[in-house]
Protein backbone atom coordinates (compact mmCIF):
# COMPACT_ATOMS: atom_id res chain seq x y z
CA UNK A 1 0.00 0.00 0.00
CA UNK A 2 1.62 3.25 -1.14
CA UNK A 3 -1.07 5.50 0.36
CA UNK A 4 -0.18 7.31 3.58
CA UNK A 5 -2.19 9.80 5.64
CA UNK A 6 -0.72 13.29 5.78
CA UNK A 7 -1.38 16.92 6.57
CA UNK A 8 -0.84 19.74 4.07
CA UNK A 9 0.44 22.48 6.36
CA UNK A 10 -0.31 25.31 3.96
CA UNK A 11 -3.75 24.00 3.04
CA UNK A 12 -4.87 22.92 -0.39
CA UNK A 13 -7.68 23.04 -2.93
CA UNK A 14 -9.43 19.81 -3.88
CA UNK A 15 -9.54 19.05 -7.59
CA UNK A 16 -12.73 17.00 -7.10
CA UNK A 17 -16.18 18.47 -6.54
CA UNK A 18 -17.87 17.50 -3.29
CA UNK A 19 -21.57 16.63 -3.43
CA UNK A 20 -23.93 19.03 -1.66
CA UNK A 21 -27.21 17.87 -0.28
CA UNK A 22 -29.82 17.57 2.46
CA UNK A 23 -30.43 14.49 4.57
CA UNK A 24 -33.96 13.85 5.81
CA UNK A 25 -34.20 12.49 9.35
CA UNK A 26 -35.04 8.79 9.32
CA UNK A 27 -38.37 9.24 11.10
CA UNK A 28 -39.54 11.57 8.29
CA UNK A 29 -37.86 9.80 5.36
CA UNK A 30 -40.06 8.87 2.42
CA UNK A 31 -40.11 9.38 -1.33
CA UNK A 32 -43.07 11.74 -0.90
CA UNK A 33 -41.22 13.86 1.68
CA UNK A 34 -38.00 14.18 -0.29
CA UNK A 35 -40.00 15.00 -3.44
CA UNK A 36 -41.99 17.73 -1.64
CA UNK A 37 -38.82 19.25 -0.21
CA UNK A 38 -37.04 19.31 -3.56
CA UNK A 39 -40.15 20.78 -5.21
CA UNK A 40 -40.28 23.62 -2.66
CA UNK A 41 -36.58 24.35 -3.14
CA UNK A 42 -36.93 24.38 -6.93
CA UNK A 43 -39.88 26.76 -6.68
CA UNK A 44 -37.46 29.20 -5.06
CA UNK A 45 -34.24 28.43 -6.97
CA UNK A 46 -34.03 27.92 -10.73
CA UNK A 47 -30.89 27.83 -12.83
CA UNK A 48 -30.64 28.65 -16.51
CA UNK A 49 -28.41 26.70 -18.90
CA UNK A 50 -28.43 28.18 -22.38
CA UNK A 51 -32.14 28.09 -23.30
CA UNK A 52 -33.31 25.63 -20.66
CA UNK A 53 -34.00 26.04 -16.98
CA UNK A 54 -33.89 23.54 -14.16
CA UNK A 55 -34.16 23.40 -10.40
CA UNK A 56 -31.20 23.11 -8.06
CA UNK A 57 -32.64 20.20 -6.04
CA UNK A 58 -33.03 16.58 -7.04
CA UNK A 59 -34.53 13.91 -4.77
CA UNK A 60 -32.10 11.00 -5.04
CA UNK A 61 -33.46 8.74 -2.29
CA UNK A 62 -36.22 8.78 0.28
CA UNK A 63 -33.85 10.49 2.72
CA UNK A 64 -31.47 12.47 0.49
CA UNK A 65 -31.85 15.51 -1.77
CA UNK A 66 -28.88 16.48 -3.92
CA UNK A 67 -28.26 20.20 -4.48
CA UNK A 68 -26.33 22.23 -7.02
CA UNK A 69 -25.09 25.67 -5.97
CA UNK A 70 -27.08 28.56 -7.40
CA UNK A 71 -24.85 31.03 -9.24
CA UNK A 72 -25.75 33.91 -6.89
CA UNK A 73 -24.20 31.99 -3.99
CA UNK A 74 -21.05 30.73 -5.70
CA UNK A 75 -18.87 32.73 -3.27
CA UNK A 76 -20.88 31.94 -0.14
CA UNK A 77 -22.09 28.35 -0.02
CA UNK A 78 -22.69 28.48 3.75
CA UNK A 79 -25.24 31.27 3.26
CA UNK A 80 -26.85 29.27 0.47
CA UNK A 81 -27.39 26.36 2.84
CA UNK A 82 -28.70 28.71 5.53
CA UNK A 83 -31.27 30.05 3.07
CA UNK A 84 -32.18 26.55 1.82
CA UNK A 85 -32.85 25.44 5.39
CA UNK A 86 -35.28 28.33 5.87
CA UNK A 87 -37.51 27.45 2.92
CA UNK A 88 -40.94 26.45 4.23
CA UNK A 89 -42.29 23.34 2.50
CA UNK A 90 -45.74 23.52 0.87
CA UNK A 91 -46.70 26.87 2.44
CA UNK A 92 -49.91 28.39 1.06
CA UNK A 93 -50.15 32.02 -0.04
CA UNK A 94 -52.22 33.16 2.95
CA UNK A 95 -49.86 31.64 5.52
CA UNK A 96 -46.84 33.08 3.72
CA UNK A 97 -48.36 36.56 3.71
CA UNK A 98 -49.02 36.41 7.46
CA UNK A 99 -45.49 35.18 8.10
CA UNK A 100 -44.02 37.96 5.94
CA UNK A 101 -45.87 40.62 7.97
CA UNK A 102 -44.40 39.17 11.15
CA UNK A 103 -40.95 38.97 9.57
CA UNK A 104 -41.13 42.64 8.55
CA UNK A 105 -41.57 43.72 12.16
CA UNK A 106 -38.64 41.50 13.14
CA UNK A 107 -36.52 42.82 10.26
CA UNK A 108 -36.85 46.38 11.52
CA UNK A 109 -35.69 45.37 15.01
CA UNK A 110 -31.84 45.14 15.14
CA UNK A 111 -31.81 42.18 17.56
CA UNK A 112 -33.87 39.99 15.22
CA UNK A 113 -32.98 41.54 11.86
CA UNK A 114 -30.38 38.96 10.77
CA UNK A 115 -32.69 35.96 11.08
CA UNK A 116 -35.67 37.80 9.59
CA UNK A 117 -33.62 38.84 6.54
CA UNK A 118 -32.56 35.23 5.92
CA UNK A 119 -36.16 34.02 6.09
CA UNK A 120 -37.33 36.76 3.74
CA UNK A 121 -34.49 35.89 1.37
CA UNK A 122 -35.68 32.28 1.44
CA UNK A 123 -39.15 33.43 0.36
CA UNK A 124 -37.61 35.13 -2.67
CA UNK A 125 -38.87 37.89 -4.96
CA UNK A 126 -42.17 38.26 -3.11
CA UNK A 127 -40.20 39.55 -0.10
CA UNK A 128 -38.22 42.22 -1.98
CA UNK A 129 -40.54 45.09 -1.06
CA UNK A 130 -40.14 44.34 2.65
CA UNK A 131 -36.37 44.15 2.41
CA UNK A 132 -36.44 47.48 0.58
CA UNK A 133 -38.11 48.95 3.67
CA UNK A 134 -35.23 47.59 5.71
CA UNK A 135 -32.54 49.46 3.78
CA UNK A 136 -34.38 52.70 4.56
CA UNK A 137 -33.84 52.15 8.30
CA UNK A 138 -31.55 54.48 10.24
CA UNK A 139 -30.02 51.49 12.04
CA UNK A 140 -26.88 50.14 10.28
CA UNK A 141 -27.58 46.53 11.28
CA UNK A 142 -31.07 46.60 9.81
CA UNK A 143 -29.70 48.33 6.71
CA UNK A 144 -26.95 45.76 6.29
CA UNK A 145 -28.98 42.57 6.74
CA UNK A 146 -31.68 43.90 4.41
CA UNK A 147 -29.17 44.96 1.75
CA UNK A 148 -27.28 41.66 1.99
CA UNK A 149 -30.47 39.68 1.36
CA UNK A 150 -31.41 41.99 -1.53
CA UNK A 151 -27.97 41.47 -3.07
CA UNK A 152 -28.43 37.69 -3.18
CA UNK A 153 -31.85 38.30 -4.72
CA UNK A 154 -30.13 40.28 -7.47
CA UNK A 155 -31.60 43.69 -6.58
CA UNK A 156 -29.43 46.59 -7.74
CA UNK A 157 -30.36 48.97 -4.90
CA UNK A 158 -28.43 46.77 -2.47
CA UNK A 159 -25.06 47.74 -3.97
CA UNK A 160 -24.75 51.40 -2.80
CA UNK A 161 -25.84 50.43 0.72
CA UNK A 162 -23.34 47.56 0.95
CA UNK A 163 -20.59 49.76 -0.50
CA UNK A 164 -21.16 52.41 2.16
CA UNK A 165 -21.33 49.90 5.01
CA UNK A 166 -18.19 48.06 3.85
CA UNK A 167 -16.35 51.38 4.07
CA UNK A 168 -17.75 52.55 7.41
CA UNK A 169 -18.39 49.37 9.44
CA UNK A 170 -15.55 46.87 9.74
CA UNK A 171 -17.85 44.17 11.14
CA UNK A 172 -19.85 44.10 7.90
CA UNK A 173 -16.93 44.39 5.47
CA UNK A 174 -16.31 40.76 4.48
CA UNK A 175 -19.99 39.89 4.12
CA UNK A 176 -20.72 43.09 2.18
CA UNK A 177 -17.87 42.50 -0.26
CA UNK A 178 -18.82 38.84 -0.71
CA UNK A 179 -22.40 39.83 -1.51
CA UNK A 180 -21.21 42.49 -3.98
CA UNK A 181 -18.92 39.94 -5.66
CA UNK A 182 -21.91 37.69 -6.34
CA UNK A 183 -24.01 40.41 -8.00
CA UNK A 184 -24.11 40.75 -11.78
CA UNK A 185 -25.43 44.31 -11.80
CA UNK A 186 -23.13 47.16 -12.87
CA UNK A 187 -23.88 48.99 -9.61
CA UNK A 188 -21.99 46.25 -7.75
CA UNK A 189 -18.98 46.68 -10.02
CA UNK A 190 -19.10 50.44 -9.41
CA UNK A 191 -19.20 49.87 -5.65
CA UNK A 192 -16.27 47.44 -5.63
CA UNK A 193 -14.21 49.77 -7.83
CA UNK A 194 -14.97 52.66 -5.48
CA UNK A 195 -13.80 50.62 -2.47
CA UNK A 196 -10.43 49.99 -4.16
CA UNK A 197 -9.77 53.70 -3.44
CA UNK A 198 -10.49 53.32 0.28
CA UNK A 199 -8.10 54.66 2.92
CA UNK A 200 -8.37 51.29 4.68
CA UNK A 201 -5.80 48.74 3.51
CA UNK A 202 -8.10 45.86 4.46
CA UNK A 203 -10.99 47.34 2.50
CA UNK A 204 -8.87 47.98 -0.57
CA UNK A 205 -7.50 44.45 -0.75
CA UNK A 206 -10.92 43.01 0.12
CA UNK A 207 -12.40 44.95 -2.81
CA UNK A 208 -9.66 43.65 -5.11
CA UNK A 209 -10.43 40.07 -4.03
CA UNK A 210 -14.16 40.66 -4.54
CA UNK A 211 -13.50 41.93 -8.06
CA UNK A 212 -11.29 38.90 -8.78
CA UNK A 213 -14.02 36.54 -7.58
CA UNK A 214 -16.59 38.39 -9.67
CA UNK A 215 -14.53 38.21 -12.86
CA UNK A 216 -10.97 36.79 -12.74
CA UNK A 217 -10.50 37.77 -16.38
CA UNK A 218 -11.16 41.47 -15.81
CA UNK A 219 -8.24 43.68 -16.98
CA UNK A 220 -8.32 45.30 -13.53
CA UNK A 221 -7.30 42.05 -11.82
CA UNK A 222 -5.81 39.78 -14.49
CA UNK A 223 -2.23 40.78 -13.65
CA UNK A 224 1.08 39.51 -14.98
CA UNK A 225 1.76 35.81 -14.54
CA UNK A 226 5.17 34.53 -13.46
CA UNK A 227 6.15 30.97 -12.55
CA UNK A 228 4.40 30.29 -9.25
CA UNK A 229 2.76 33.68 -8.66
CA UNK A 230 0.89 36.63 -10.16
CA UNK A 231 1.78 40.33 -9.95
CA UNK A 232 -1.05 42.86 -10.02
CA UNK A 233 -0.88 46.63 -10.29
CA UNK A 234 -3.98 48.64 -9.35
CA UNK A 235 -3.96 52.29 -10.38
CA UNK A 236 -5.16 54.08 -7.24
CA UNK A 237 -5.17 57.64 -5.97
CA UNK A 238 -5.06 56.43 -2.35
CA UNK A 239 -1.77 56.01 -0.51
CA UNK A 240 0.60 53.47 -2.07
CA UNK A 241 0.39 49.94 -0.66
CA UNK A 242 1.83 46.48 -1.34
CA UNK A 243 -0.10 43.35 -0.36
CA UNK A 244 1.66 39.98 -0.40
CA UNK A 245 -0.86 37.18 -0.02
CA UNK A 246 -0.18 34.54 2.63
CA UNK A 247 -3.15 32.31 1.76
CA UNK A 248 -5.27 31.00 -1.12
CA UNK A 249 -3.35 32.49 -4.08
CA UNK A 250 0.31 33.41 -4.52
CA UNK A 251 -0.08 37.03 -5.56
CA UNK A 252 1.45 40.45 -5.06
CA UNK A 253 -1.00 43.34 -5.35
CA UNK A 254 0.41 46.85 -5.66
CA UNK A 255 -1.91 49.82 -5.18
CA UNK A 256 -0.76 53.19 -6.50
CA UNK A 257 2.22 54.33 -8.52
CA UNK A 258 5.83 55.24 -7.94
CA UNK A 259 6.80 52.47 -5.50
CA UNK A 260 10.55 51.95 -5.65
CA UNK A 261 13.04 49.52 -4.14
CA UNK A 262 16.09 51.51 -3.00
CA UNK A 263 18.26 49.43 -0.67
CA UNK A 264 20.99 51.38 1.10
CA UNK A 265 23.22 48.32 1.07
CA UNK A 266 23.37 44.80 -0.32
CA UNK A 267 20.24 42.81 0.47
CA UNK A 268 19.40 39.14 0.15
CA UNK A 269 16.30 37.79 -1.58
CA UNK A 270 16.30 34.19 -0.41
CA UNK A 271 19.52 32.20 -0.06
CA UNK A 272 20.90 32.68 -3.55
CA UNK A 273 19.88 36.12 -4.82
CA UNK A 274 21.67 39.38 -4.02
CA UNK A 275 20.41 42.86 -4.88
CA UNK A 276 22.85 45.74 -4.99
CA UNK A 277 22.05 49.42 -5.47
CA UNK A 278 24.31 50.65 -8.27
CA UNK A 279 23.13 54.26 -7.92
CA UNK A 280 21.52 56.46 -10.59
CA UNK A 281 18.27 54.50 -10.23
CA UNK A 282 19.82 51.14 -11.17
CA UNK A 283 19.92 47.81 -9.33
CA UNK A 284 22.12 44.78 -9.99
CA UNK A 285 20.36 41.47 -9.26
CA UNK A 286 22.62 38.41 -9.02
CA UNK A 287 21.81 34.75 -8.47
CA UNK A 288 24.53 32.32 -7.36
CA UNK A 289 23.58 28.64 -7.17
CA UNK A 290 26.00 25.74 -6.79
CA UNK A 291 26.30 23.71 -9.97
CA UNK A 292 24.52 26.29 -12.13
CA UNK A 293 25.76 29.28 -14.13
CA UNK A 294 25.61 32.63 -12.37
CA UNK A 295 22.70 34.77 -13.54
CA UNK A 296 22.43 38.55 -13.56
CA UNK A 297 19.85 41.23 -14.32
CA UNK A 298 20.04 45.01 -14.24
CA UNK A 299 16.81 46.84 -13.48
CA UNK A 300 15.49 50.22 -12.47
CA UNK A 301 14.36 50.74 -8.88
CA UNK A 302 10.69 50.55 -9.90
CA UNK A 303 9.05 47.69 -8.02
CA UNK A 304 7.57 46.12 -11.15
CA UNK A 305 11.01 46.03 -12.80
CA UNK A 306 12.56 44.52 -9.67
CA UNK A 307 9.93 41.75 -9.60
CA UNK A 308 10.61 41.04 -13.26
CA UNK A 309 14.38 41.00 -12.63
CA UNK A 310 14.16 38.59 -9.70
CA UNK A 311 11.99 36.26 -11.81
CA UNK A 312 14.48 36.55 -14.69
CA UNK A 313 17.39 35.23 -12.60
CA UNK A 314 15.27 32.35 -11.29
CA UNK A 315 13.69 33.79 -8.17
CA UNK A 316 10.11 33.15 -7.17
CA UNK A 317 7.42 34.24 -4.76
CA UNK A 318 9.38 33.68 -1.56
CA UNK A 319 12.45 35.52 -2.87
CA UNK A 320 10.34 38.54 -3.80
CA UNK A 321 8.77 38.47 -0.34
CA UNK A 322 12.24 38.45 1.23
CA UNK A 323 13.27 41.37 -0.96
CA UNK A 324 10.27 43.46 0.09
CA UNK A 325 10.88 42.73 3.77
CA UNK A 326 14.57 43.61 3.55
CA UNK A 327 14.37 46.69 1.32
Region locations from a protein language model:
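Sec-exported extracytoplasmic/periplasmic mature domains
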Residues: 42, 46, 85, 89, ...
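Extracytoplasmic/secreted envelope proteins and their assembly/folding machinery
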Residues: 34-38, 42, 62, 77-85, ...
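Structural detector for internal amphipathic alpha-helices that build alpha-solenoid repeat scaffolds
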Residues: 113-123, 133-134, 143-155, 164, ...
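Short inter-helical turns and helix N-cap capping residues of alpha-solenoid HEAT/ARM repeat scaffolds
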Residues: 109, 138-139, 168-171, 199-200
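Extracytoplasmic/periplasmic terminal helices and flexible tails
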Residues: 1-106, 111, 115, 144, ...
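Amphipathic alpha-helical scaffolding segments comprising HEAT/armadillo-like alpha-solenoid repeats
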Residues: 93-105, 125-136, 155-167, 185-197, ...
